[in-house]
Amino acid sequence: MPAAQPAGDSLAGRVVGTRVFGFSQGERAGRRDDFVRAVLRGALEAQYRSGMGRADYVDLLTAGSMPEACRLPQRYRADWLESYVSRLLGRDLREFSRLSDPRRLRSLLAGLAAAQGSETVVARLGGAVNLSASTTTSYMELLRALHLVERLPPWTPNLLKREVGRSKYLLTDSALAMRLTRTSPDILKDLVRGGALGGLLEAFVAAELMRQSTWCEERFTISHYRSPDGREIDLILELDDGRVIAVEVKAASSASAADARHLRWLEGRIGDRLVAGVVFTTDDRSRHLGGRLWAVPVAALWELG
């Protein structure tokens, strides 16, 4: 009878695991970015101005977060991204699973890219590429293992209650999402035709915060919220002590009181647990919306930190 194979060393207590992301905007600019720390230190209370507008944010999305791709002209960046996905799904994937279909995985990835910012309906997403719900779920976990996709779970205000609602799955590299959906930067810059910017910008903000969460001073989790009666909040940042920073992302160049209505509702529900409600916009200046609520430029994510 053959001897039992020794179990691999878990390295418990000697190795700390972490998720792998592309460069943050702060890293690209050579500066420290820690938005949560800035909020906790009261940075939102000071008037803040950024020199960026809608077209500038589209350029950031188009460049993406992968160091090699960022430096390339747009035409060659598209070729690089195509090669990157093909090699990752065609060769590297074999290390994780020999039962997967690279073509369907790419179609699934493109479907996720097209739904940036939306709750993921697994049956609908898989049905579009003739996959069962269980296989679709397995494939999405493979895409997470390849660091192409991240899961944004639904937020439950009470830890004693079960998690409710659907997760959001998002591509953390905006350039890859745009490439997979054949989204033109010129269209995104157009106020009439650029409706897709909203979902891409929401995923971009979420990805920036995910990157910052790996080095920030205060530990926090990132999720999204949908109440039983349909109120939605794009991102919930919850600190270890239970305090919350709630985030909405708008592609508009300004924010109105209506854009913050769900944040104001949350403020009424959780009271002092809410440190701040933030509406990110493509405006070039911040505005106080009353109470603990502010509208700020997206660039505050890395310029305030």
State where each predicted segment sits.
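Short beta-strand/turn micro-motifs composed of small residues
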Residues: 226, 280-281
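Active-site-adjacent loop/helix micro-motif of nuclease/hydrolase catalytic cores
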Residues: 253-263, 305
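Arginine/glycine-rich "motif VI" loop of SF2 helicases in the C-terminal RecA-like domain
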Residues: 214-215, 265-273
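Accessory nucleic acid-recognition modules appended to NTPase machines
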Residues: 70-244
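Interdomain motor-coupling "hinge/lid" segment immediately C-terminal to the ATP-binding subdomain
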Residues: 4-114, 118-119
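Switch/connector loops and helix/strand junctions flanking conserved nucleotide-binding motifs
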Residues: 2-6, 26-30, 178-179, 256-257, ...
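Active-site ExK catalytic segment of metal-dependent nucleases
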Residues: 245-254
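Domain-level recognition of nuclease-like catalytic cores that cleave nucleotide substrates
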Residues: 282-305
